[in-house]
Amino acid sequence: MNDAALLASPLFRGATSEEIAAMLPCLGASPRRFARGERILRAGEPTRYMGLVLTGSVLVEHTDLQGAVTLLGRAEPGDLFAEAYACASDELLLVDVVASEACEVLFLDARRILTQCTSTCEHHSRIIRNLVRTLAQKNLALSRRSLHTGPRTIRARLLSYLGEQAQRAGSRSFTIPFDRQQLADYLNVERSALSNELSKMQRDGLLTCRRSSFWSTSMQAPKHTRPIPNRN
């Protein structure tokens, strides 16, 4: 099993390799390998298990009634997926989780995580705290995305998102965690329209950009002195 991925996971924050190994049986841990393109979790079905990526990567996708697929997220070693659905247990998944390459996933039983073991060990309590923190962080990330995709125009969406990134960096010069296609998907716009608007914004003197690096001339320098950790 990939100890590095387990140690990097927010679920096991603060735990040693030995402590994690001792906790896994209590959490109903079950590893499984998937081939590229194989469906890990299917929309329309419930799950009591959350997944932790050990090797490779997985995609979280939504398919509409016409068959159009929208990429909602990507999970890499150490990342969790489907934890909110697993904790709700009776909620049907609205998304598919698909292996983007050969991967190994560790499934964890949400009911066994949320129910204290008979020894009421400190390690189990830490896992619950870490899970709540992870759920809160992902909820805030969804709230930020809703804020950035709320404006009607592409320019307004870009200014909203890039303004936040400048604030997080504590500088007018910053690098975003997306390439151009990923940024278009995140803001829910067409890539060509996004590229055209960025070109217009550069001509208007609002910013300069190269790939994922930006320098804003339109926003005031952030007043805080400590950069905000980027959770996107």
Set out the residue ranges of the language-model regions:
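Short, Lys/Arg-enriched, Trp-marked, Pro/Gly-tolerant hinge/linker segments that flank
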Residues: 122, 142-154, 167-173
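Long, hydrophobic or amphipathic alpha-helical segments
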Residues: 125-128, 132-142
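Cyclic nucleotide-binding regulatory module and flanking cytosolic helices
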Residues: 1-36, 85-88
